[in-house]
Amino acid sequence: MAANMKAVKLRIKSVQSTMQITKAMELVASSKLRKAKERAEVCRPYFETMHQTLVDIAQGNTDFSSVYARESGNEKRCYVLIAGDRGLAGGYNTNLFKCLEAASVNQDFLVLPIGKKAVEYSKRNGFACVTESFGEIADVSVADCFEMANLLCGEFKKGEFGHIDLCYTKFVSMLSQQPSAIPVLPLKDLTDEQDTKSIRNLILYEPDASEVFDAIVPEYLAGLIYGAVCESVASELAARRTAMEAATNNAEEMIEKLNLHYNRARQASITQEITEIVGGAEGV
């Protein structure tokens, strides 16, 4: 009985220690999440404006033509896979990888992994990678996103692949994060976004609209990648906060059950001792 009580007490201390860790991780994630949300929200107007600029160029010029805005016939794809650097975030990374697997079924594709987990996943599955230079999502800067965009656009123009897709986790709310695989290039739908403009070619582009368009696309892609990185970081922190909150609650419930078990064992031990004392006294 005493040995059993000692084991329960050690288990309680172990669970309490784990609960302190999960609670601390929950608080850290909550603190970082607010800044990550603000950064993600600040990014959105930038690439929305860039997208509208591209639409205006494509729609406003009858002689418009760009390698970035037409199908090349090359069905090979490149997925920019944005995952986290660490685990302990529930199904955050696993759900993203399932999204990639569903999107890439029966396809010939390359991967540009961003984040430690994305690099590890790509290596483990033997995916061909454009580069593995961005293994820490926490260290990805705006300059890094421009570097990635220029690399991808260069390979796209050379015909290494005919499509570029972003595979990341969209931040919806504190309790909802949505893995998504969205096509980025070619921008073939721009000219389909007609809005009944009756006056065209009011803006003159030098040297011409197509060259301006081709110069803007890498910046647009860099903005999309950076926005997706910000959304992914916010999603990872939200998922980790939720997971650690659930772990803390589970630990509290377990401690309550263990304390109840310990108190019952202690009560039984005391009752047994009293019975033995009474029995001994009666024997005398």
Where are these regions (language model features)?
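C-terminal beta-strand-loop-alpha-helix "lid" module of Rossmann-like NAD(P)-dependent dehydrogenases
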Residues: M1-V284
